[in-house]
Amino acid sequence: MLRFDLLAGCALAATLFAGSAHAQDLQSRPVAPPSSSDPALSAPAAKPNDAEQVQFSAGSLEYDTNTDIVTALTDVRMFRQGDRLRADKVVWNRKTGRVVATGNIAVTNPEGDVAYGDSIELTDSMKDGVVENMLVVLEQGGRMAAERGQRYADGTLQLDKAAYTPCTVTNPQGCPKEPSWKITAIRITYRPDRERVYFGGGQFHLFGLPPLPLPAFSLPIGGKAESGLLAPDFQLDRVNGLELVAPYYFRLAPNKGLTLTPHVFSAVLPMMEAQYEALGTNGAFRITAYGTESRRSDDLVTITPTDTERALRGYIDGVARYQLSPYWSVSGSVRLASDRTFLRRYNISRDDRLRTTASLERIDPNTYFALTGWYVQSMRVNDPQGTQPIALPELDFRKRMDLAGGRLQLQANTLALTRTAGQDTQRAFVAGQWDLRRLTNWGQEVTLTGYARLDAYNTQDTQLTSVASYRGLEGFQTRAIGAVAVDVKWPFVGSFLGGTQRLTPRVQIVGAPRIANLAVPNEDARAVDLEDSNLFALNRFAGYDRFEDSSRATYGAEWSVALPGATLDAVIGQSYRLSERPTILPSGTGLSDRFSDIVGRTTLRIRDFVSITHRYRLDKDGLAVRRNEVDATIGSRSTYVMAGYLRLNRNIFPEIEDLQDREELRLAGRVQFARFWSAFGSTVIDLTDRNEDPLSLSDGFDPIRHRIGVQYEDDCIRLGATWRRDYQDTGDARSGNSFLLTLALTNLGR
């Protein structure tokens, strides 16, 4: 409907646009489109043999019997097989079948697209016709305008001297504005059956800049995947030079697609990237491959890299999952690189390990079975690939059942680890854990636990493992494990500052006999560290190869506060070993003495604006901070800051490489300084010095990398510029600056 309450600014803007948009007026017209509730639709339905009959209504109707011309005046509505027309005046020549409509015209097709015009000439089928000063608003988004448009019986629209945009043409106040981008063309053809728009003699307009000529092309509407060129990227860095990325997507089927992406560099040979993905009724998979030829450095340690001859280099990344039945599924992933620096040199990934897995699983309410295989490729400097284990196979079976008022879980597990240049291990065990949970009349939650396990190991080449405590004994070994525990929680609830608080003291007693831990190898329980998440665990080692065999008492408390718009959760605790026998836990883990270190966690959340988590570990003797970890997020979706700080000061022996101390700072943030503009940045800084790592050569402030950028994003375009700097050399992945430009347009590669 026509609005009479427009602001003066809107009126001025409309006047300004009127002068420049006389040929292709993309602004909305002051007329409501006909709807399915129009009066014409409430007329008596046509008889089955009159399916082609036109229904209409009007304020007045004139009929000239001599010329057989019908003239409908005042808010005319016509309907025929899903096509609806609204106009001020309609003249219908029944002899020739010619229909001419004028004044506030709006035509809606069965797909929901609405066409506006000054005048329209139709056949009496309402299927084809010619429109002057045409505007088409597509149901699936976007609009087209033309000096003249023609519609054919199959629904195809042909527009001459036309323009197209998927962008909004009004600001939040309803005032008209130029779209962020549009395409003008000598001819635009819209095929509703294909959901595509075809352009001939086109020009690309962006933010009012001089237009760029375009070749003949087409693009999809409605957000469906269609073949075509995707959004390009531009990047400049020290090693590869200027990079142009121009992906092209091939829609092979409704559920299959292939994307070919050439990466063209100014300083090195091009690289090709291909990604194939398919979705089926039972699952999906995706595989990506990169390939090029370039020089690489096999020496990752020296300051001055040494180059080899040119070599084929590449990377494969794939993932798949299929649900074979309601209970059975198969999944897998593959990540393999030709060498250790390829991913970093071409800015693909900075992961230091690549995992390849395959798994067959069965899951039902009380049973779990998995057959899994693992392969790990190391990307780390001075980490021989031959020492990386190949886990094939790993079988894990678990069964839950009710027993004696409690819950019994049975488990059987086997694992074979093979190394090409290291220790080989085969392991099998069967275990059972029974838990009985009860609530007392005073509100205490009491849990009784019994655990038993029988292990069998077979180990070869133990002397190839450098850390003696990880080796175990050569050959076949067996081990029996048993433990019992009682865990008591006593929650107290009350009011606090207009909200509620809950204080829960907790005490746990665990008893376990001496276990032959060092007789078997340690493959999966090396990175042991006391923290709040494992304080009350039955076994505070991470894996199965080591089990904490001392009897101990663990005590602590949880405190939570819930206020309007805010929550606070805190936990703190410590353990005391009841037996005096020596422990296998390394010094520095917080568990090596009879009294453990004190660990805790505090989490503060204020609505969706503030989230702060602090984890800590305090030395039991002088309360020195052995672990200090803070993760904070403050802000909204558009403007926020994220900070992470970690300092591990545990004084662990240097030969235990899985538990090295370090200190680092991570910062990231985004600031929206205008409606569509934002600036962002992130950095990682290594703060490690000899206080944390005696072997460190760092001065305590070594930036690893940083990233700073600016981005514009509205409803139909995303444009960004990013500067990234890497500070560390690794072979041919050199330090230096890189610059990235990104451009993504709605319906054009986005």
Regions found by a protein language model. Name each.
Residues 11, 15, 57-61, 486:
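Short, Lys/Arg-rich amphipathic segments at extreme N-termini
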Residues 12-13, 50, 79, 177:
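Generic anion/oxyanion-binding catalytic loop in active/binding sites
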Residues 1-3, 63-66, 749-750:
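Short, intrinsically disordered, low-complexity terminal/loop segments
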Residues 116-121, 126-130, 136-183, 191-750:
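Outer-membrane beta-barrel proteins and related beta-barrel translocases across Gram-negative bacteria
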Residues 24-161, 182-190, 195-197, 260:
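N-terminal amphipathic/hydrophobic interface segments
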Residues 2-22:
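Gram-negative bacterial Sec-dependent N-terminal signal peptides
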